[in-house]
Amino acid sequence: MFGIKYHRLDKEAPLQMHWGFFRKKLSLFEGVAFIISGTIGAGILGLPYAVSKVGPLLGVLFIVILGLLMMGLNLMLGEVLVRTKDHLQIVGLSHKYLGIFGRVFMTTMMYSSMIGILVVYIIGEGQALASLFGRTPLEWSLLFLAVAAVFIFRGLKTFKIFDFFLTVGVLMVVSIITFACVPYIKMANLAFSSFKDFLFPYGVVLFAFASSGAVVEAHGILKDSEVNFKKAIIIAGSICILVYATFALAVLGVTGLETTEIATIGLASKVGSSFFVIGNLFAALAMGTSFLVGGLAFKHSLCWDYKVPRQVSAAIVCLVPLVIF
């Protein structure tokens, strides 16, 4: 995979994305940042609780093994993207290679999950920002959606300017939380294991690594370099595995069996209220970037896979979650 020269089906015709969103080639680091921002979201805050159900050793094994499997899945998806001349998202790829059944199945599954996730992020963003700055969650949710709508309507050409810095901000906040936990870690909290809820972490960890939509978008960003595309997938996947495992162990070392479903709530009770503020800051950043990446992937799927006009696609992405919200 990626290690040999491919002869494109369009006889090496240069790949041009629709509507000029990708006129400039972005660097490898920006491609990595885009995949990370589409992977690390609010799901990371639930990882320590999931790990606490089975113990640190089994929990980290879940994170590493599922992380590597998802990285392999993304590399296989990358192989398909490299060999496909059409500009397609997951739904379109399913139609092209699996027929009408694949299209119907993936449309139902992907679009329903995308809409649900966007609604959850709108609600969560409102709660996080209200905790940080006051006023009501409803006001912040609507304000967030209004700002996000600007990026979704304008497309990735505008969002890519901010994405790298937002991703750096997310990683910095996670690092601050992790290192701040170190003085409070008790080894006794890391010396247990349980098989009672052996499969409990599976869904949580798998959700935390979901990033197929971001990988498809990254292919457009790194269209001129198949080598950098492969590197971006591997580097981003490795960073996510390292961040998830380190964060889960650090939190578990502090809160042990008292780990809460949202990690920062338990940390605030053990270490101090400052963790509650930092946790809300992280949640706001992570959910914001994930919402934008997911929204752009949804928009591009409507455009590329169903040929819906660009502005209509953006309106659907913004208005449908708003109506449900």
Outline where the language-model segments fall.
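Membrane-interface "cap" regions at the ends of multi-pass membrane proteins
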Residues: 1-49, 54, 71-75, 87, ...
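Helix-loop-helix connectors at the membrane interface of multi-pass transporters/channels
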Residues: 3, 92-96, 122-141, 221-225, ...
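Helix-loop-helix junctions that connect adjacent transmembrane segments
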Residues: 9-23, 134-143, 155-269
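Transmembrane-helix boundary/entry motifs in multi-pass membrane transporters
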Residues: 18-30, 55-63, 76-116, 130-137, ...
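Transmembrane alpha-helical segments of multi-pass small-molecule transport proteins
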Residues: 32-39, 107-111, 123, 131-155, ...
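Hydrophobic alpha-helical transmembrane segments of multi-pass membrane proteins
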Residues: 35-36, 61-65, 105-116, 146-149, ...
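Central hydrophobic cores of alpha-helical transmembrane segments in multi-pass inner-membrane proteins
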Residues: 42, 66-76, 144-153
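Transmembrane helix-loop junctions in multi-pass membrane proteins
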Residues: 43-48, 118-126, 148-158, 182-187, ...
